[in-house]
Amino acid sequence: MVQKTSMSRGPYPSSQEIPMEVFDPSPQGKYSKRKGRFKRSDGSTSSDTTSNSFVRQGSAESYTSRPSDSDVSLEEDREALRKEAERQALAQLEKAKTKPVAFAVRTNVGYNPSPGDEVPVQGVAITFEPKDFLHIKEKYNNDWWIGRLVKEGCEVGFIPSPVKLDSLRLLQEQKLRQNRLSSSKSGDNSSSSLGDVVTGTRRPTPPASAKQKQKSTEHVPPYDVVPSMRPIILVGPSLKGYEVTDMMQKALFDFLKHRFDGRISITRVTADISLAKRSVLNNPSKHIIIERSNTRSSLAEVQSEIERIFELARTLQLVALDADTINHPAQLSKTSLAPIIVYIKITSPKVLQRLIKSRGKSQSKHLNVQIAASEKLAQCPPEMFDIILDENQLEDACEHLAEYLEAYWKATHPPSSTPPNPLLNRTMATAALAASPAPVSNLQGPYLASGDQSLERATGEHASVHEYPGELGQPPGLYPSSHPPGRAGTLRALSRQDTFDADTPGNRNSAYTELGDSCVDMETDPSEGPGLGDPAGGSTPPARQGSWEDEEEDYEEELTDNRNRGRNKARYCAEGGGPVLGRNKNELEGWGRGVYIR
């Protein structure tokens, strides 16, 4: 009976097997064998299970074995588009190498590219740190600029725009929040309670400071627009407007004019550019306060001077500013100028005292003010200065400055970029001069372009030493001789006529050295009249720079014998006592006669 039932059930699976083989005849032998194996292992047939497994397996194979033509075509299209975009980006990068610099920025944040940043060309993004300088050539798209890091050996690449940096910052903050949440959830109760206790003990003071830091970081932009070439500004050894400081800075200006002839623009700035703070210029409510205060410069004059400096820097020439009002690096720390601060340092206060006293009573009576200003500069950390010139010999200090500026020139002028057009530079400098305000109208166009005119100081006075780090009410500075200052007292700086009275006629006839046989056209103020050069007010004959070792009796004879600038042995800073300075007390005056600020 059992056999009959088994025999009667036999045709059913065979009848079920036929349509399956018709549906898919190709795997007939394989699946027939598989079914035979099931029969031998089990006493009864399991055709339902076999057929179900067959259908499931067949459907999976049909799904995976069917390559989606649309997916393949999409992938190919995406790859082709990516390669084409990369090719165009590389071509645009290559063209940007010879394009002029559109503008420059100073970074407030750092950037290290990662694969997920979607750089137009992988591996060509620029890495930079905070306080680096970037030359921007052009805008590639809304997320990326094309430019280069101002550093020797760096080529053009892709720089994230402020929009891109903000988006990357937001993504990073989201990841940090998620990590904190996951770490807090994974922590056990004991660690969380311990963390609460620790944070509870710190809650009284830090939250306010943390909020302040958060606000300050939120409002800081990633980039600050700065001049394409950082302007060079000299400070020290004491206050400007006094003979010792003026003649030392004048010697360096003379050196720069000849060493970088054709590559430097030297211009005088009489406006108080320390007022050009971003917080002041961007806040209209502060404009009224400054306009009402007793300042020597209006905001319109300051803004005009800043624009003129930016225009001069666009030529990619070196720009040196003879700024009357800048005596401390803190005055420019919050401006957009980002200058190269050169600190002329006299290490020994005794040497500075001897130099001041050697200039006569007119300078000695202001000894305390100058010493206090020198001490104020000496207290600054070295990070506030780009170059510190503390050499004893003038020529050593000049070479130190020249090495720094040569390196900066190479960093701003890579070999791949085309050299600037001298005619364009001269035209732009002259145009910038024409747009300059009245206080700097005495500047000459050729002097801005190639440094052919002499520098000039105006009669004026200085504020107290404690005022020059940037107080808005009483900014320091020089006042034009045609506008006598309203303040007077022991802190009043000497007028130019006062300083000349302390010198001999031979001192007033001396001038700085000119290369070759060229003459120097002396500029004079209306209040001075003749007396800087010859009695008729003409030009001063070229002379070599004096040395502290020159004897007073031999000075007039040496002026006619030695006119070679290369033989200059002038020493502008010395350490120690008398034996280091020279042979007698009169040798301190040789500096002032050989190189005198006009």
Swiss-Prot record:
Superkingdom, natural source: Eukaryota
Main localization (coarse): membrane
Keyword entries, A-Z: Calcium, Calcium channel, Calcium transport, Cell membrane, Ion channel, Ion transport, Membrane, Phosphoprotein, SH3 domain, Transport, Voltage-gated channel
Domain (SH3): residue spans on this chain: 100-169
Topological relation to the membrane, as annotated: Peripheral membrane protein
Compositionally biased region (Acidic residues): 548-559
One annotated GO molecular function: calcium channel activity
PTM sites of type Phosphothreonine: 499
Cellular component terms per the entry's GO annotation: sarcolemma; synapse; voltage-gated calcium channel complex
Keyword Ion transport found: yes
Places the protein is found: Cell membrane, Sarcolemma; Cell membrane
InterPro entries reported for this sequence: CAB1-4_N_A-dom, GK/Ca_channel_bsu, P-loop_NTPase, SH3-like_dom_sf, SH3_domain, VDCC_L_b1su, VDCC_L_bsu
Pfam families: Guanylate_kin, VGCC_beta4Aa_N
GO biological process: calcium ion transport; chemical synaptic transmission
UniProt-listed Gene3D superfamilies: P-loop containing nucleotide triphosphate hydrolases, SH3 Domains
Composition bias type Low complexity, residue spans: 43-53, 182-193
Family, per entry: Belongs to the calcium channel beta subunit family.
Summary of subunit composition and partner proteins: Regulatory subunit of L-type calcium channels that consist of a pore-forming alpha subunit and auxiliary beta, gamma and delta subunits. Interacts with CACNA1A, CACNA1B, CACNA1C and CACNA1S. Component of a calcium channel complex consisting of a pore-forming alpha subunit (CACNA1S) and the ancillary subunits CACNB1 or CACNB2, CACNG1 and CACNA2D1. Identified in a complex with CACNA1C. Identified in a complex with the L-type calcium channel subunits CACNA1C, CACNA2D1, CACNB1 and one of the gamma subunits (CACNG4, CACNG6, CACNG7, or CACNG8).
Protein function: Regulatory subunit of L-type calcium channels. Regulates the activity of L-type calcium channels that contain CACNA1A as pore-forming subunit. Regulates the activity of L-type calcium channels that contain CACNA1C as pore-forming subunit and increases the presence of the channel complex at the cell membrane. Required for functional expression L-type calcium channels that contain CACNA1D as pore-forming subunit. Regulates the activity of L-type calcium channels that contain CACNA1B as pore-forming subunit.
Xref: PANTHER family: VOLTAGE-DEPENDENT CALCIUM CHANNEL BETA SUBUNIT (PTHR11824)
Name this polypeptide is given: Voltage-dependent L-type calcium channel subunit beta-1
Species: Bos taurus
